[in-house]
Amino acid sequence: MKRNGESHLNGEAKKSRTEQNQEQQDYQDEYYSSSDEELLPSSQTSPVFDIAHSNSDKWQSTIRKVVNSVVSIQFSHVAAFDTETALVSEATGFVVDAERGLILTNRHVVGPGPFTGYVVFDNHESVDVKPIYRDPVHDFGFLQFDTKDVKYLKLTQLDLDPSLAKIGTEIRVVGNDNGEKLSILAGIISRIDRNAPDYGALTYNDFNTEYIQAAASATGGSSGSPVVNEDGKCVALQAGGSTEASTDFFLPVSRPKRALQCIQKGLPITRGDIQVEWQLKPFDECARLGFTAEAEAEARKMFPDKIGMLVAELVLPEGPADGLIKEGDTLISIQGEYISTFVRVDEILDENVGKELEFVFQRSGREIKQMIKIGNLHAITPDRFVHVAGASFNNLSYQVARCYCLPVRGLYVCDGSGSFEFSNQDTLGFIVETVDDKPVANLDEFVEVMKQLPDCSRVPVVYRHVSDMHAEYVQTIYIDRHWYTSFKLAVRNDTTGLWDFTTLQKEALPPAALVPQNAKYVDIPFSDPSRAECSKLVRSFVQVRTLCPSGVDSHPFKKDIGYGVVVDSTNGYVLVSRRYVPHYMCDIFVVFAESIDVAGEVVFLHPHLNYAIIKYDPKLVLADVQSPKFSETPLKRGDDLFFIGYNYNLRVVTDDVKVSSISSLNVTANSIAPRYRGTNLECILLDSKLTHECNTGVLVDNDGTLRAFWLSYLGESNELSFKMGLDVTDVLSILKSLQANHIPKSLRMLDAEFASLTVLQGRTRGVPQTWIKRFEDEAQDLIKFLSVDRVSAPTFEAKPSPLKVGDIVLSVNGKLVKNMRDFASMYDETSLTFNIIRQKQEMTLEVPTIDTTSMETSHVVSWSGALLQKPHYGVRQLMTKIPSEVYIVDKSSCGPAHQYGIVPISFITHVNDQETKDLDSFIQVVKLIPDKTYVKLRLVSFDNIPAAISLKTDYHYFPTTTLKRDAVSGKWNTEKINE
């Protein structure tokens, strides 16, 4: 995998904090191609030969033998763990034991965490593989397959011979280069004593080994390729390369060969270490560090082919060598044996785990002897993690500790999500020290603390980032155990290749009982006594915090903070923009006077006017919360108003403003990921720059009467939002219902969008002069017509709308339609009588309205890493026909859905050729499908392009789960179908 010297494993340019300005020179070969290409048909993937050095018959014969042992690895790291993120990718491996079905590849392919995958042989047979070993430090690991599953290919294996790797040796790299089925790259070994390449911080790095260097120009996907000589012997393992040259780095196969022999003999693969990183430094540099001339002469005499010695680069605190070896010490011997190579150090340490050995080294010209106990490298390599409250944790690993010279201890956040999302930018690199003021030095202590925390509780957490251990951070987090119900321990099982899950707590402790709390508002100071009532309007504002656990309805934000307006303080109702409350599947917190917060509940979502109503318990708030007075007169262009709002810094600001225009418009759609947007709006625009810095506010008269809500409207991109006013008269009927403590359960609406036309445009398209005169006579502001801009795709139960794009609306139920507000009668009527102009002909239509009761998302299915739901209204608005009600809204970065090519914003129409019109029929089909079997899916893209793919289920890591919202209680109920 290309790492470009960066700290993030998925190829994104995300550098560690200490290396922001440092350009790295090395990369680790991508084990996936740079694009999400699928494997090409065999007719398009013939071997790519690089014959710059040789084209002998012997090479041709060797390559024919080698390719039968080389496999393409298609795999997934199904969970973030240690230095690795969850991802789907591809790489190369090769058979080293045909009888046992053993495949050698890179450690960064096998990964330290959960792995699933399969391999494809040269004849396109594919078999499942399981990981059986990954080295704690060096970049190699082994996968295993059942040889009985290979039916049409005679298995061959490559022999490992590290002794044949010599300078000048002509080699071939045979592998899955850049995602191709098979590429063969030529090169010549130029170095055999290179230090291990540095791939950056917070990612996997090899160390304490020599690397072999050659110029082969390998790219993504070639990780794990065998490097063979002319006789077909594997002399090295492809691992990485340079981003600025054609240089590649190969791992010597001496340690993989030893590990393979242990596996074949059924012996444990012992690994010893003293937590010291050594670097091979040339003799002149050793001399500058204090290596004496006499010692150099002796070393050159004993090792005439060597150019340097091993020097201590890093000694980890609290490790076996801490205080005994110091940085800059030059290693001379171990247990009486003189040392010149990393290989011999590995051999000695691996054979003496738990024993004390004598180390002799020079420090500033003095020879020093120390007895050091050899530690067990496997003991400081984590093999378990805990998943709770949406985040994952493991004990700090040797890999991470070495990057920043830390003791190998502590609780490491390997997936900072859910309740433990400390930063929007970084999800890796955090060490948690205390939770709820209790120390959590390791996983066991952390588990016991988390068991005692009730759901929905708020607790302080103390943490640091490994890149800056000087800085201590304290943050109050919200413990979410109702959306993120899983609290489990995962332990690696090298026999089965799986990670075994153990539930640590079936249900969280119930939330603590809430008690009423006091809060005090500070009124806005005004020198003008006529605005005394305006100063109290701060008591009508509340902060609204939203947590959305999933990507339902393609809403882009998991966490958001905005403000709302209390429209009924007696019953506890707040009006807020749907920019912050997009759907029912979220947690809401209402904060009063920046002092106390109480839980809120979404009780009403307006289908097109971009506002939501949330409810809180007013008995829990002992503060002077007030509802404003509401005007019953619509605003006009030119009206003078007073603005009170909250800016980007969440601070209240005020301004005198004037209504510059009132426009009929629709918010621009996002066709890549359709989501909720405001439509058929009659929006108020102002002549003030200050108001555009505020996402929430109110427009009032001098006496404090509220004339309009100032709201944020999410635009076509995540970064773009529009700020516009919504006239209070447009929501007055809903507000009056709330004041009667009645929540509207159902509105009706027209299933179409309308846009404004000038009189000239209307005249050109056939509007008669008599109608134009009627509009001119009744106009109070701009004279315009409304035309049908878009007609939404109907649901399966509904009939298509009789309206067509381009229809010019003259009247509805006999009333002229001068602006969007004239459609308001649709909320209570099952049908409306339209007078329209279509193709210059005047027509009368009966247009039915649609019921919005079931419009919002209330049923979600998680299947094979894909998130499925009924197409929400934002999807139907942009389509003319819905292929199916099984809509793929999102997918995980590591599940079967991603691995086998399911694309979000598409539809599943058939499963195993059985039609799946809706989620219920889909569940009925998939619940009968066994685990680890292939499923045929028929898909239709958002652009109505059909496709067929196959997908292999994996219920161990990706069980089928449904979430349904109870219409009465508003609670979401979870049910697991396949697990």
From Swiss-Prot:
Q: From what superkingdom does this record's organism come?
A: Eukaryota
Annotated ranges, domain PDZ:
277-362, 871-943
Q: Where in the cell is it found?
A: Nucleus
Bias regions of kind Basic and acidic residues — which residues?
Answer: 1-20
- Does the UniProt entry include the keyword Hydrolase? yes
Short name of one Pfam family:
Trypsin_2
Positions of the UniProt region annotated as Disordered: 1-43
Enzyme group, top EC level? Answer: hydrolase
Recorded GO terms, molecular function?
A: serine-type endopeptidase activity
Q: What's the Enzyme Commission number for this chain?
A: 3.4.21.-
Biased composition range(s): Low complexity: 21-34
GO cellular component terms listed in the entry, alphabetical order:
nucleus
UniProt keywords, alphabetically: Apoptosis, Hydrolase, Nucleus, Protease, Repeat, Serine protease
Region (Serine protease) residue ranges read 65-260
Please name the CDD domains in this protein's record. Answer: cpPDZ1_ScNma111-like, cpPDZ3_ScNma111-like, PDZ2-4_Nma111p-like
Q: Does the keyword Hydrolase apply?
A: yes
Cite a single GO BP annotation: apoptotic process
Active site location: 108, 139, 222
Cited InterPro entries: PDZ-like_dom, PDZ_sf, Peptidase_S1_PA, Peptidase_S1C
**Family, as annotated:** Belongs to the peptidase S1C family.
Spell out the protein name for this chain.
Pro-apoptotic serine protease NMA111
Q: Which organism is it from?
A: Lodderomyces elongisporus (strain ATCC 11503 / CBS 2605 / JCM 1781 / NBRC 1676 / NRRL YB-4239)
